[in-house]
Amino acid sequence: VSECLVGSEMCIRDRAINTYELVKPGDKIAVCISGGKDSMLMAKLFQELKHHNKFDFDVKFLVMDPGYNEANRHVIEENCRNLGIPATIFESDIFDAVYDIEKSPCYLCARMRRGHLYAFAKELGCNKIALGHHYDDVIETILMGMLYGAQVQTMMPKLHSTNFEGMELIRPLYLVREDDIKAWRDYNGLHFIQCACKFTDTCTTCNNEENRSKRVEIKQLIANLKKVNPFVEANIFKSVENVNLATVVAYKKDGIKHSFLDHYDE
């Protein structure tokens, strides 16, 4: 596994972590493993990072079982063993809690999972949780916000928790492409779960492309745009780094909306 990790490990260490100052001396980071390819690679990269890094920090590898069926739980445990990841598994009943909710169960599930991860990580003395979102997640989120939410925003590389004082969320794979993660998975002949909730209990073998979600639609839109403009992904990513407030009609800061008219005649 380590042979195919070298290139990606340099990416996580020298790009996202340094660019956005994600890891600092003395940090104790809870690396959150969902069981998918992204979080598993992130866990391996943190092992490499800790081994080669110039300053000291600590990591804990966490797997939250929100109610996986036996097959999915087994896949996660086997992958952790095969990859040499000393993961701590803790239980929750999130799947049961959201199972009967008709409106936006996935959104609620994600929020609850993050809250449980923050809480358990804090109990372990961690000051940060690391999630496995990657570059493609970021650009898809930008477009989803524009096309379906009427807003310009991005998935941040790090942010302070609003509910757990002293805790931060970091995304070390922020600059890693999904195709590179898939290449690592395929090179090593690995198999991971995808979404494994009670709504999609067959997801040890399912294909995410069958899920006609908004994110899949956006992914397909980007792929089509890339056929015409090979730079479209980078341009979407950079667009939220180049916002000129002098050329927007309005913007929000700290929940307050500001209009260009506020200072138009000054």
List PLM regions with ranges.
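Residues that form or immediately flank small-molecule/cofactor binding pockets and catalytic motifs
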Residues: P66, S92-I94, Y174, C197, ...
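Residues that recognize and position ribonucleotide moieties
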Residues: E3, A110, Y174
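Short, basic, helix/turn surface patches
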Residues: R111-L124, K158-F164, I218-S239
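Positively charged, low-complexity/disordered segments
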Residues: V1-G7
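The feature marks non-catalytic terminal segments
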Residues: L190-E266
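ATP-dependent adenylation/nucleotidyltransferase module used to activate substrates
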Residues: S8-E9, R13-V152, M156, H160, ...
